[in-house]
Amino acid sequence: MASSSSLVPDRLRLPLCFLGVFVCYFYYGILQEKITRGKYGEGAKQETFTFALTLVFIQCVINAVFAKILIQFFDTARVDRTRSWLYAACSISYLGAMVSSNSALQFVNYPTQVLGKSCKPIPVMLLGVTLLKKKYPLAKYLCVLLIVAGVALFMYKPKKVVGIEEHTVGYGELLLLLSLTLDGLTGVSQDHMRAHYQTGSNHMMLNINLWSTLLLGMGILFTGELWEFLSFAERYPAIIYNILLFGLTSALGQSFIFMTVVYFGPLTCSIITTTRKFFTILASVILFANPISPMQWVGTVLVFLGLGLDAKFGKGAKKTSH
């Protein structure tokens, strides 16, 4: 049968990818904050969700099952020749970025996490230039600098005498920095796959998530987090519904993410995932009353001004070697 992505006309593929990513991850972000920052129980016995590894494990299982279904029905003719070690390396950086990003939500609110992750095009670009010898036009670099300035304004916080709060904010930002670095390494791996093996989007999604499931499965068994999570879910069974919805929105969103990576490259994908985040921030502010200062709003405007200029003037990269 024909590949699922080949059923989409070329001129509609990029708008479809953007719309799919926007809709799926809009709801994904709301569910993520509801799960990780919600309070469970009543009175003095209230608990919080602290099982970041297990949450990503469930997410990867659902992603892998969804990708397998797509291959079974739409992509049976494609033969995947990508090396297993490349999938393994990509999954390590991929799940490392996801776990550190999810863990950061325990120390920073969702808008801060989202704006921090908006820097994703920077490591993807820099590592593409240094490791894959890509070249980008000057306008692209200027747009990225504008994004950096906006994010810096957003992340800046005047000193306060609050003790523990200062420590937790710093730790959350460190986790976001780690997540960004790993995002860049993931982008390099994916670019290598599409250039050398013409890896299909569904096969990429399936194998990266299978490796991630294996690694995370060992992690949650070794740390004992799985049993703690099961006990938590037994006390608060309502969370299971939200986690399953979270996994489903992740799987749908990832199918569009990998389609974008395969057809347009990791940098375009990172820019798409960033542009949709402004609306996610607005939803978080409205639904969860997360405060945003005037300086942070200026930073937000700069970030998305840079992205808008990039869409207009920043053309694709040229490869000098691969």
From Swiss-Prot:
Compartments in which it is found: Endoplasmic reticulum membrane
Main localization category: endoplasmic reticulum
Motif Di-lysine motif per record, residues: 318-322
One annotated Gene Ontology cellular component of this protein: nucleoplasm
Membrane-crossing segments per the record: 12-32, 51-71, 85-105, 136-156, 168-188, 210-230, 243-263, 285-305
Membrane topology field: Multi-pass membrane protein
Keyword flag ATP-binding: no
An annotated Gene Ontology molecular function: UDP-galactose transmembrane transporter activity
Keywords for this protein: Antiport, Endoplasmic reticulum, Membrane, Phosphoprotein, Transmembrane, Transmembrane helix, Transport
GO biological process entries: UDP-galactose transmembrane transport
Stored InterPro entries: SCL35B1-4/HUT1
Record has Magnesium as a keyword: no
Function description: ATP:ADP antiporter that catalyzes the exchange of ATP and ADP across the endoplasmic reticulum (ER) membrane. Imports ATP from the cytosol to the ER lumen and exports ADP in the opposite direction. Regulates ER energy metabolism and protein biogenesis. Appears to be part of a calcium-dependent ER to cytosol low energy response axis, where calcium efflux from ER to the cytosol triggers ATP import into the ER lumen to maintain sufficient ATP supply. Provides ATP to ER chaperone HSPA5 that drives protein folding and trafficking in the ER.
Domain notes from UniProt: The di-lysine motif confers endoplasmic reticulum localization for type I membrane proteins.
Family that this chain belongs to: Belongs to the nucleotide-sugar transporter family. SLC35B subfamily.
Record protein name field: Solute carrier family 35 member B1
Top-level taxonomy: Eukaryota, Metazoa, Chordata, Craniata, Vertebrata
